[in-house]
Amino acid sequence: MDLGKTVEYGTHRQDAIAQIDVPDQVLYTIGSFILIIGSVGIIGNMLVLYAFYRNKKLRTAPNYFIINLAISDFLMSATQAPVCFLSSLHREWILGDIGCNVYAFCGALFGITSMMTLLAISINRYIVITKPLQSIQWSSKKRTSQIIVLVWMYSLMWSLAPLLGWSSYVPEGLRISCTWDYVTSTMSNRSYTMMLCCCVFFIPLIVISHCYLFMFLAIRSTGRNVQKLGSYGRQSFLSQSMKNEWKMAKIAFVIIIVFVLSWSPYACVTLIAWAGHGKSLTPYSKTVPAVIAKASAIYNPIIYGIIHPKYRETIHKTVPCLRFLIREPKKDIFESSVRGSIYGRQSASRKKNSFISTVSTAETVSSHIWDNTPNGHWDRKSLSQTMSNLCSPLLQDPNSSHTLEQTLTWPDDPSPKEILLPSSLKSVTYPIGLESIVKDEHTNNSCVRNHRVDKSGGLDWIINATLPRIVIIPTSESNISETKEEHDNNSEEKSKRTEEEEDFFNFHVDTSLLNLEGLNSSTDLYEVVERFLS
């Protein structure tokens, strides 16, 4: 029977094949497979939306695209699978012309929305990684919401076109689903098919490939530049920051690859028909690619369940019945250290003459120092030997992350030693010379100031010294957005922290880091610093 032959039913054109001689078990198998795919897509994408609803830390601006992708995939599964399953049981399309139009319209709308959302994710990751300064204005929640609205409007335009006369929606393949008429060789159908494939599939695919190629080159270039930095701590921080951004990009890349592989067979079939070889396409060759394309709705939650640590953690905590499928990820020490130290940057970043150092709350060596000082009194020789023994491994280990590099010298030592200390604020309280780097506001040049120990053993040298303020600068855009989100959602915690800062900080003196006035002994100093760090 000629598949290209058509007849008119009112204003709609449908295939003249009323019944297709297909074994019942084949239709039942296809229908059952579609039902399973639809069920997994509905449940999986609901879990994704539930995870973003329960975990406020996931509601960052870049993740809005993931939420939009989950919504479109959920609606795709909910509108396509049940109808297709019922039609397979009846061995033909059962909802008539209006149902065919609605079914095909929904499939086109949600499918195009998913593709355009993946394109937006790729562009967003590209800007964040290659142009981090410009990404600040393009990665706000308001701007992200505007982009999502444009994605839906663009998808709606292409989905409405067949209803307005540019091509048409007809049953396809085994007549258990509907799509636009890409088989009939008319100018309207051919032009719509070509424009749809180019503007919705091929051009976005080229843009996505371009974005990820230059993202990879930027990551490699940044990695080389980081290796040239002299500070191990700065190397580690920048490397980890770029790793976080690249991790998000890799998750999106896996989703995009799977999505493209799912829709590629369908695109090939439409192009074969567009080239004038539609008669060579069998009902099976048109139905199977359509089923594979609609199955793309289930891959997003599966990929997130495997790769995304925060998603796994949220599902593991809130859905106990899925704990045997989703393992709880290990805690990210880097993220916790940055969030735990973020309040140090909020008040100190506005000071003009401070040197910005990237540090974290790493473990301190103070306990070892105090254990080796008899009766709590500082002894120059014993303290020097203890500090050298503790810090020498850090000089040999290039992987020691989140460290504060300072130059520590003794006043009378003709050959000062450079050692690398953990980034604890306790290190500045020891009776040793401390060199700090400050920036002159007039000449815009950096200079080194050496703060010597008072030979009398007093604490005035600490109070009067120009110490560098220690702030946290998260170079990662995702860290900035997550920090803003936590700051907005934890106002009570912020007020408590502010009260604590007022107790232990004294910023009315431009050159002091801690309020050390009124201290008479090293024991008092140790207690103040201990309270500050706790």
UniProtKB/Swiss-Prot annotation:
Residue ranges, compositional bias (Basic and acidic residues): 482-499
Transmembrane segments: 33-53, 65-85, 103-123, 147-167, 199-219, 251-271, 287-307
Ranges facing Cytoplasmic side: 54-64, 124-146, 220-250, 308-534
Protein location: Cell membrane
MF GO annotations: G protein-coupled photoreceptor activity
Domain of life the protein comes from: Eukaryota
GO CC term (a single one): plasma membrane
Tissue: Highest level in the iris, high level in the inner nuclear layer, possibly in horizontal cells, and lowest level in retinal pigment epithelium. Expressed in melanophore cells of the skin.
Keywords on record: Cell membrane, Chromophore, Disulfide bond, G-protein coupled receptor, Glycoprotein, Membrane, Photoreceptor protein, Receptor, Retinal protein, Sensory transduction, Transducer, Transmembrane, Transmembrane helix
Keyword Cell membrane attached: yes
Modified residue annotations for N6-(retinylidene)lysine: 294
Disulphide bond pairs: 100-178
Extracellular-facing ranges: 1-32, 86-102, 168-198, 272-286
UniProt key word Hydrolase: no
Membrane topology classification: Multi-pass membrane protein
Glycosylation-annotated residues: 189
Disordered: annotated segments: 478-501
GO biological processes: cellular response to light stimulus; G protein-coupled receptor signaling pathway; phototransduction; visual perception
InterPro entries, per database record: GPCR_opsins, GPCR_Rhodpsn, GPCR_Rhodpsn_7TM, Opsin, Retinal_BS
Its job: Photoreceptor implicated in non-image-forming responses to light. May be able to isomerize covalently bound all-trans retinal back to 11-cis retinal.
Family designation: Belongs to the G-protein coupled receptor 1 family. Opsin subfamily.
Protein name from the UniProt record: Melanopsin-B
Gene: opn4b
